Design a protein with these regions (language model features):
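Polyanion-binding catalytic cores of nucleic-acid enzymes and NTP/SAM-utilizing transferases
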Residues: 111-275
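Glycine-anchored helix-breaking recognition loops at helix->coil/strand junctions
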Residues: 272, 291-295
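Alpha-helix boundary recognition
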Residues: 35-36, 172, 216, 288-289
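A general structural signal for well-ordered secondary-structure junctions
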Residues: 41, 221, 293-294
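Short, solvent-exposed loop/turn segments at secondary-structure junctions
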Residues: 21-23, 70, 175-178, 194, ...
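Signature of N6-adenine DNA methyltransferases within the class I
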Residues: 1-157, 161, 198, 261-273, ...
Length: 295
């Protein structure tokens, strides 16, 4: 987008068909801010989950912007029909004028929906102002070594019962369902790097000879990885490791309709999940899984 913007003449226009993830995802904040501050977004068409383009493997959108000041009057629509005879006619009949003025999620709403949204925001409390924390799952840098199946877990514990102290169940993004999860019998060797703020020392792998023997099979890869701890045997720093032991909400990072599950068993998650800790997490789980939240 920025490269195209750079070669535009003043008031020149650019139209792209791309993935629509930038419209709402956190990683799209800087791009949304760029559009709002540097361009005039004239037309935005979100195809949502409808596969209009045969060669596209992702949900798509069309954005047309001009190289001029944002007039704060974007003609936008969401395509809700799977089969379109004439996109131009559909756009003229269903588009609405919307202001996109900052990095907040770009959500296309009808005039009635915009009024409802404004009314809710006027009396409600934004999620960011609730007493919660949101964290990413555990990054190992080399899952093949640190994430093991149940058979390997049993072997390590049989060889050295002390191994059980740092082996914990782990969920992946694909395991998360609405109000539940499908445990794939995967386990994390949690050789964490300590939590300095809490006075927790890093795991000394020499205290766990069976696990060290297992990890030594992958030592060249462990040594090369960028996100390691004090030693190649340790995971990278994770200041919120204790939060995985608290009551929390787990949800995957890449699905169209996010499922949420409440956990109080101390499950760990991989990098394909996020967790939410804090107050009212049971209530929030129910709300996040509701049709009201999806609306």
């Amino acid at each position: 987008y920025e490269l195209g913007y750079d070669i535009l003449k003043p008031k020149g226009t650019l139209t792209y068909i791309t993935s629509n993830k930038w419209m709402r995802a956190a990683y799209g904040e800087s791009l949304r801010n760029f559009f709002a501050e540097k361009t005039n977004p004239d037309i935005l068409i979100d195809f949502s989950g409808n596969q209009i383009f045969d060669t596209a493997t992702v949900d798509t959108n069309i954005l047309m912007f001009s190289k001029e000041e944002n007039k704060q009057e974007t003609h936008a629509c969401v395509v809700k029909e799977k089969l379109l005879i004439n996109l131009g006619d559909y756009f003229r009949q269903n588009s609405t004028k919307t202001k996109f003025i900052n990095k907040d999620s770009w959500v296309i709403l009808s005039e009635i929906e915009q009024r409802i949204k404004a009314k809710v925001e006027a009396v409600g409390t934004p999620l960011k102002d609730w007493d919660i924390n949101i964290y990413r799952g555990v990054l190992t840098g080399y899952n093949e070594a640190f994430i093991i199946d149940g058979k390997k877990k049993d072997e390590l514990i049989a060889e050295d019962p002390k191994s059980a102290e740092i082996i914990r169940p782990i969920l992946r993004g694909r395991d998360i369902k609405k109000y539940s999860y499908e445990f794939a019998d995967l386990w994390l060797i949690n050789s964490h790097n300590g939590i300095k703020e809490n006075g927790v020392k890093p795991i000394n792998i020499d205290d766990y000879p069976a696990i060290k023997k297992h990890l030594n099979l992958f030592y060249p890869q462990l040594e090369k990885r960028a996100d390691k701890g004090d030693t190649p045997y340790n995971l990278r720093n994770c200041a919120y490791m204790d939060d995985f032991s608290k009551q929390k909400i787990i949800y995957p990072n890449m699905t169209k309709f996010l499922p949420f599950v409440f956990d109080e068993k101390g499950l760990l998650t991989n990098q394909k999940c996020f967790i939410i800790t804090g107050k009212h997490v049971e209530y929030l789980t129910a709300f996040f899984n509701s049709s009201l939240f999806k609306y």
